[in-house]
A protein has these predicted regions:
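Extracytoplasmic/periplasmic solute-binding protein
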Residues: 149-153, 158, 182-230, 275
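Extracytoplasmic "Venus flytrap"/periplasmic binding protein-like
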Residues: 63, 67-134, 143, 165-176, ...
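Extracytoplasmic/periplasmic substrate-binding proteins
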Residues: 51, 64, 111, 243-327
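N-terminal secretory signal peptides
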Residues: 1-14, 23-29, 37
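Conserved C-terminal helix/tail region of periplasmic/extracytoplasmic solute-binding proteins
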Residues: 3, 70, 168, 377-428
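Hinge/lid segment of periplasmic solute-binding proteins
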Residues: 105-159, 182, 209-211, 237, ...
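Long, aromatic- and glycine/proline-rich binding clefts that accommodate carbohydrate-like moieties
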Residues: 140-141, 299, 348-396, 403, ...
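Glycine-centered hinge/linker elements that transmit conformational signals in sensory
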Residues: 185-187, 227-258
Length: 428
């Protein structure tokens, strides 16, 4: 028997998904991550805390849970949280009141909890289900010291999104080089539309723009050296990045007053034909009506240095078993069921996520299939500034990049401050 309960949802922004509902088979008894669960038959349950704010994807997750219950007789309790609130809550519930399964991020975000002994090693599940055979290089996103601590779920390929009809109306072409981009921006300005929609109220979109430029000017190795605290924010190799970025700001290529816009509000400008392009993930589709979605197209960020290889920003979400989970075997059984190709595909489809398994059927979403094809030519990937960096360094960087975009004359002060933060965090 399943129960349903609505939990208050915070009003903070959703990162990768649109708004959704909350489901739980929880009424009374012990607490998991701050949520009550039944005192009776807890051993026959698998508890999960998710951060799924896309309503259709959450419905798919509920359906998968129901299918698992029907097949195994084990009930799945899903407590869904706001995406942003979950980033704080997980730091508490992994220590006390852990669920059996939780959603999170792969890469450095995962490793921070692995180093603290808060995620369970599920290498046995990988071996049993032969996941390495179907994941290929993506398995590395959840691997630390040769062991696997989660399953990669959906990936987001970041890039330049635009409306095909807007490009046709104004005679615009997708910029392939730095020169193309500047010409594109000038043409947009002449047509009365903003070249690049961006909202930096939530900080991270500015860091995403930095990532794209740094990857294309300095390459992946130097970019990751900066992310890992091994390179100075005053390094001369970053001069060209900020010179070109400052030139774009000076020409008025970005949304005016962007610090007052959230990413969803900025995406609405793209949907409303008030901007030409936007650097984001396919989740910006939530700003478009169903009728307008066929107009949405993807392009890679322009090449800024032809000598630099093809690197992209590709962030991967993941699902984990906390080290303090009470029903670890039940959690493994549920993950194996959830990760079946047909189930994972049903979960990923609503959000336009790129599948981590190569044995899933083609998506109904052409943007996803374009992303899959793009990834075949990529020489390496980063995840995203705030996923690749130390959390404290990331927060300082997010604030700094927004400040630079709003007040480019503060560039030297911003970079000097970031360098001081780097030295403090990495004890240099």
């Amino acid at each position: 028997m399943a129960f349903s309960k609505q939990f208050p949802e915070t009003t903070r922004r959703s990162f990768l998904k649109g708004a959704g509902a909350v489901s739980a088979a929880a009424v009374t008894g012990a607490a998991v991550g701050g949520f009550p669960i039944p005192a009776i038959a807890q051993a026959q349950e698998v508890t999960m805390i998710s951060a799924e704010n896309n309503g259709a994807a959450l419905d798919a997750l509920k359906a998968i849970a129901a299918g698992f219950t029907k097949e195994s007789g084990v009930n799945v309790v899903i407590n869904n949280m706001d995406h942003e609130a979950h980033k704080t809550a997980i730091r508490n519930y992994l220590v006390a009141g852990a669920p059996d399964v939780c959603s999170w991020f792969s890469g450095n975000r995962m490793r921070a909890f692995v180093k603290r002994g808060l995620f369970d090693d599920i290498s046995d599940l990988f071996e049993k289900e032969k996941y390495k055979d179907v994941l290929g290089a993506t398995a590395g996103a959840v691997t630390e010291d040769g062991k696997q601590y989660g399953l990669p779920t959906g990936g987001t390929l970041w890039g330049m999104f635009y409306r095909k009809d807007v490009f046709e109306q104004h005679g615009l072409t997708v910029p392939k080089t730095a020169e193309d981009f500047m010409a594109y921006g000038d043409k947009c300005k002449a047509a009365g539309i903003t070249p690049i929609a961006i909202g930096t109220k939530e900080l991270w979109p500015a860091a995403g723009w930095f990532d794209q430029m740094n990857l294309r000017i300095n390459g992946l190795d130097k970019h990751m050296a900066l992310m890992n605290g091994e390179m100075s924010y005053l390094d001369p190799s970053l001069t060209d990045v900020f010179d070109q970025w400052e030139a774009m700001i000076g020409k008025g290529f970005f949304t005016p007053n962007h610090t007052s816009f959230g990413w969803q509000e900025a995406a609405a400008l793209l949907a409303q034909k008030k901007a030409g392009m936007m650097n984001l993930g396919a989740f910006l589709r939530s700003a478009f009506t169903e009728a307008d979605l066929p107009q949405l197209a993807y392009a890679t960020f322009p090449v800024l240095d032809a000598k630099v290889g093809h690197f992209e920003e590709f962030s991967v979400n993941s699902i984990h078993i906390p080290a303090k989970a009470k029903n670890k075997q039940g959690a493994r059984d549920f993950l194996a069921y959830f990760y079946r190709p047909e189930n994972l595909a049903a979960y990923l489809e609503p959000g336009g996520n790129v599948p981590p398994r190569h044995d899933l059927p083609p998506s109904k979403d052409p943007l996803v299939n374009v992303a899959v094809e793009t990834m075949k030519t990529v020489q390496g990937t980063s995840q995203y500034y705030d996923r690749d960096s130390d959390p404290d360094m990331a927060q300082a960087g997010l604030v700094g990049f927004q400040e630079f975009m709003a007040k480019p004359d503060r560039r030297k002060a911003v970079l000097t401050r970031l360098e001081g933060t780097r030295k403090r965090i990495y004890k240099i």
